[in-house]
């Protein structure tokens, strides 16, 4: 987005609070925001042009108590959207498949396991899309600097979000090819005595830890903590 539009702000749960940047924005600004379930609980008028829910897996149940409650809060990101807006959803997630018919926005699917009639998907190592006018091969995942199927899913979601907003595909794909892992998310640290170290301290639930382990291509030792 920053390559497409200079007046772009990356805010929210990812680091910089939305409230810290909001007074710098105007009607032509773009904000890319990661919104937590805690923040969605109290959001009343939040209306994204393009929203995305990448998955719904057990997390923060000490606050939300049940998966039904947690799913409802996550899905509420779309509550103020209309058919003029878009929502990017993971086709492999059973919660999101059940939610899709109720979603007020236009749904855009992505899948790492299934070739979709409409949406973004993997065929072997190729990221493809079909929006109703035939299959288009976008790129090979081997050209990326990220590893792991879950990262390929994240990239498909990011491509879908940016394309729905109107960013040229050439700009999107060039950005993807040069994008490096963000801090604490399967972030390469160092190689010492033949051992490769990755920092995945953002993986704060069992599913995230499982995805990180699956991304490893060699014998792996996990150093972790927590309650699960």
Predicted features along the sequence, with ranges:
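Short beta-strand-centered segment that lines the nucleotide-binding/catalytic pocket of NTP-utilizing
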Residues: 5-17
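Short active-site oxyanion
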Residues: 6-8, 28-29, 82-87, 194-197, ...
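Beta-strand->loop->alpha-helix junctions that form or flank phosphate-binding loops
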Residues: 9-11, 104-122, 173-177, 187
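Residue-level signal for inorganic ion chemistry
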Residues: 13, 54, 70, 88, ...
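Short acidic loop-to-helix transition motifs that present clustered carboxylates
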Residues: 14-18, 37-39, 94, 181
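Flexible active-site lid/hinge loop adjacent to a nucleotide/diphosphate
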Residues: 24-113, 121-123, 128, 139-146
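Acidic-glycine-rich active-site phosphate/pyrophosphate-binding loop
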Residues: 121-139, 182-190
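Nucleotide phosphate-binding/pyrophosphate-handling subdomain across enzymes
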Residues: 141-228
């Amino acid at each position: 987005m920053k390559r497409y539009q200079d007046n772009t702000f990356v805010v929210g749960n990812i680091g910089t609070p939305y409230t810290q940047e909001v007074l710098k924005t105007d009607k032509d600004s773009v904000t890319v925001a990661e919104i937590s379930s805690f923040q969605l609980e109290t959001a009343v008028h939040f209306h994204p042009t393009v929203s995305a829910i990448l998955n719904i897996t057990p997390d923060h149940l000490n606050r939300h108590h049940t998966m039904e409650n947690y799913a409802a809060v996550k899905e509420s990101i779309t509550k103020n959207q209309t058919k003029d807006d878009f929502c990017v959803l993971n086709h492999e997630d059973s919660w999101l498949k059940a939610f899709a018919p109720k979603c007020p926005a236009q749904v855009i699917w992505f899948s790492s396991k299934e070739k979709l009639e409409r949406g973004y998907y993997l065929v072997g190592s190729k990221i493809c899309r079909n929006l109703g006018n035939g299959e288009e091969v976008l790129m090979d995942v081997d050209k990326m600097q990220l590893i792991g199927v879950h990262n390929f899913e994240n990239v498909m979601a990011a491509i879908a979000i940016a394309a729905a907003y109107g960013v040229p595909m050439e700009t999107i794909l060039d950005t993807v090819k040069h994008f490096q892992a963000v801090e604490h998310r399967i972030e390469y640290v160092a190689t010492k005595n033949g051992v490769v170290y990755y920092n995945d301290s953002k993986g704060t639930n069992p599913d995230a830890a499982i995805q990180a382990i699956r991304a490893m291509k060699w014998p792996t030792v996990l150093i972790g903590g927590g309650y699960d």
